[in-house]
Amino acid sequence: MECKNLYRVQEKDLDRLREILTICFKNDPLYSALIEDQETRERLMPHLFSCDVTECFETCEVYADSEELKGILIVSDESDHRHAFYNYFVSLKESLVTDGWLIHEDPSTKTFWNFMLGKDYLNSAWTAQLHQTRRLHVIYLAVDPEY
């Protein structure tokens, strides 16, 4: 997907992308429910978003308002199946890394189980129920609150 009005995020921008997502979702009700302990949430979220950013950069279209990345848009063209196996294995790898971080930061595995129970809210499987062959799924839309 090409867009003349948006900046196409580059690999060099991934740290900033992770930072924006961490800031924007810091007090998100869903993440607060999944990661109940605030200290654990603050330690864990940068790692979780690092996994998401890696996966999204490999499998989705990632745009920003400008090279400063004040606002970001990550979309998945779910009608494009050209790289389905590659995307599956990238997602699988990042899911395993995410699970590792969940257990590392909360050895009680409570947070890990919260994510397992909340997986329906954290994936795009529900879009199959739309019965549309051409879908563009917005994965993340976030704006740095500083701007």
Language-model features and meaning:
Residues 5-19, 27:
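A short beta-loop-alpha structural element at the N-terminal edge
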Residues 13, 56-59, 131-133, 137, ...:
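Hydrophobic, aromatic-enriched alpha-helical segments typical of multi-pass transmembrane helices
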Residues 19-39, 51-55:
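Helix-loop element at the rim of GNAT/NAT acetyltransferase active sites that forms part
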Residues 74-140:
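Conserved acyl-donor/pantetheine-binding loop and adjacent beta-alpha core of acyl/acetyltransferases
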